[in-house]
Swiss-Prot record:
InterPro entries: ConA-like_dom_sf, Galectin-like, Galectin_CRD. PROSITE patterns: GALECTIN. Regulates immune responses through the recognition of cell-surface glycans. Essential for the anergy and suppressive function of CD25-positive regulatory T-cells (Treg). SUPFAM superfamilies: Concanavalin A-like lectins/glucanases. Gene3D superfamilies: 2.60.120.200. GO terms for cellular component: collagen-containing extracellular matrix; cytosol. Pfam families: Gal-bind_lectin (PF00337). Keywords: Acetylation, Cytoplasm, Lectin. This is Galectin-10. It is found in: Cytoplasm, Cytosol; Cytoplasmic granule. GO terms for molecular function: carbohydrate binding; identical protein binding. It comes from Homo sapiens. One of its GO terms (biological process) is regulation of T cell cytokine production.
């Protein structure tokens, strides 16, 4: 299986029913506190506002947030850690009418209420201390 480059950036437009699927593996053991970060940007540049920020400090915590007009908002933190040390993971972020639902290895693990409409997303970036084997955006068929 070939690896995708990290950081990985792709243009995307999201709406209710869209799902972003990411498959990868932490590059270091959890004792070294590797990170995974997924950002849904409003423009095709890293400095743009972030509709949804999802950051995992493997083995410790998950932080979710948004950045509006250049300022971070109130972060939501969870100690729920469904990721396994040294194991491949599949992360799916689904756009629901009022929130994002985050699944890890097929299990509902986190939710984050919309602060900025998902239709504002123009780019998804996946980065930090992971090897990345899959990135896909699927859309609800109408």
């Amino acid at each position: 299986m070939s690896l995708l480059p990290v950081p990985y950036t792709e243009a995307a437009s999201l709406s209710t029913g869209s799902t972003v699927t990411i498959k990868g593996r932490p590059l270091a053991c959890f004792l070294n506190e590797p990170y995974l970060q997924v950002d849904f940007h409003t423009e095709m540049k890293e400095e743009s506002d972030i509709v949804f920020h999802f950051q995992v400090c493997f083995g410790r915590r998950v932080v979710m947030n948004s950045r509006e007009y250049g300022a971070w908002k109130q972060q939501v933190e969870s100690k729920n850690m469904p990721f396994q040390d040294g194991q491949e993971f599949e992360l799916s972020i689904s756009v629901l009418p009022d929130k994002y639902q985050v699944m890890v290895n097929g299990q509902s693990s986190y939710t984050f209420d919309h602060r900025i409409k998902p239709e504002a997303v123009k780019m998804v970036q996946v980065w930090r201390d992971i090897s990345l084997t899959k990135f896909n955006v699927s859309y609800l068929k109408r």
